[in-house]
């Protein structure tokens, strides 16, 4: 991935027309066509063009974000950012169709209307975040899923485990370009989440505008190349990692993401692990670390926001099965947003 300065732009959600009047008849024909088209949009606001986006004030649910390496401005003009309280980007991959299916069958709405209702009730916009692959068969499958559910943001970056820090930076820049949000939440596709409780957490009054929310940890730096979390830059870190959030879910306030977006990509030190990389960047900023164990609970409780099998797995072990099992528990899916006074 190139380290040159990059910006994002979204593809327009419908086609624009250009017409040069050649003769009076052509001008009248075009004018009449435009009038009829405008009238149809008033009478039939649900009309869709190319099967992609409704002609309403709602933002497109699925947007492709591309790297602009040619210039220093957004090619198609400035994108109008959709206002939300929190944007949740669920990081997913090409081998995770089963996980996405499990999420849509449990805590995440499975259709655009459900996503809209969730946004209205909680202030949260939720989308899957995925890159690209050179495997055309997998891209065909993804395009089919996009057409069916319309709940993705597509990043123009290779989807590889070794590039997760780069994908994370691309995610925050893309989310910032599309959404005017108070918090930007990075979440994995193998956790059980309560959006209603997450909404309350993000809405809490804070005295510090630069906030880093997460279940914080420290631990030894892995220096064995055979281990999954091996860190080639271990010499820069010492024997123990600094305080940083577990990777399955954390959030950055708008001011923090604004600072990330303003920096050139080659300004960032990229460590092997995405959560460590973000934690290192937070050390360079005047952020408030907010440590929340409600974001890393192993079982559903009256206060749990995110549930996953800590410390055994970095997410739910066997998430496709566990997600459904948890959702069947009343303590997970049907308990009130706020605990009762006697709990």
Swiss-Prot record:
Give the pathway.
Protein modification; protein glycosylation
Q: Which GO terms describe its molecular function?
A: hexosyltransferase activity
Where is carbohydrate linked to this protein?
Answer: 265
| Membrane topology type | Single-pass type II membrane protein
Can you name a GO cellular component term? Answer: Golgi membrane
**Compartment(s) of residence:** Golgi apparatus membrane
Q: Which GO terms describe its biological process?
A: protein glycosylation
Which residues constitute the signal peptide according to the record? Answer: none
Q: Which InterPro entries match?
A: Glyco_trans_31 (IPR002659)
State the similarity comment.
Belongs to the glycosyltransferase 31 family.
The record's function comment reads: Beta-1,3-galactosyltransferase that transfers galactose from UDP-galactose to substrates with a terminal glycosyl residue.
Q: What is this protein called?
A: Probable beta-1,3-galactosyltransferase 13
Q: Which gene encodes it?
A: B3GALT13
């Amino acid at each position: 991935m190139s380290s040159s300065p990059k910006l994002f732009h979204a593809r327009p959600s419908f086609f624009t027309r250009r017409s040069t009047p050649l003769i009076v008849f052509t001008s009248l024909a075009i004018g009449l066509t435009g009038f009829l088209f405008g009238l149809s949009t008033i009478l039939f606001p649900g009309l869709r063009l190319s099967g992609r986006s409704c002609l309403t004030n709602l933002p497109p649910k699925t947007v492709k974000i591309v790297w602009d390496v040619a210039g220093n401005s957004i090619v198609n003009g400035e994108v109008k950012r959709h206002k939300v309280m929190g944007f949740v980007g669920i990081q997913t991959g090409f081998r995770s169709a089963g996980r996405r299916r499990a999420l849509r069958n449990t805590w995440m709405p499975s259709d655009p209307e459900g996503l809209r209702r969730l946004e209205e009730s909680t202030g949260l916009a939720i989308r899957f975040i995925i890159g690209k692959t050179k495997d055309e068969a997998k891209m065909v499958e993804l395009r089919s899923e996009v057409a069916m559910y319309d709940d993705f943001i597509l990043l123009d970056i290779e989807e590889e485990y070794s590039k997760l820090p780069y994908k994370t930076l691309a995610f925050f820049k893309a989310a910032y370009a599309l959404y005017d949000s108070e918090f930007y939440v990075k979440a994995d596709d193998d956790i059980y989440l309560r959006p209603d409780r997450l909404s309350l957490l993000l809405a809490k009054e804070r005295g510090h505008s630069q906030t880093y929310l997460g279940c914080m940890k420290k631990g030894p730096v892995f220096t064995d190349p055979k281990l999954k979390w091996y860190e080639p830059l271990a010499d820069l870190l010492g024997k123990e990692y600094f305080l940083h959030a577990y990777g399955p879910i954390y959030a950055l306030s708008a001011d923090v993401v604004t600072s990330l977006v303003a920096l050139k990509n080659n300004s960032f030190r990229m460590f092997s692990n995405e959560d460590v990389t973000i934690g290192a960047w937070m050390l360079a900023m005047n952020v408030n670390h907010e440590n929340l164990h409600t974001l890393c609970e192993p079982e559903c409780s009256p206060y749990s926001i995110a549930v996953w099998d800590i410390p055994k797995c970095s997410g739910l072990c066997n998430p496709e099965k566990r997600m459904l099992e948890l959702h069947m528990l009343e303590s997970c899916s049907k308990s009130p947003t706020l605990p009762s006074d006697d709990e």
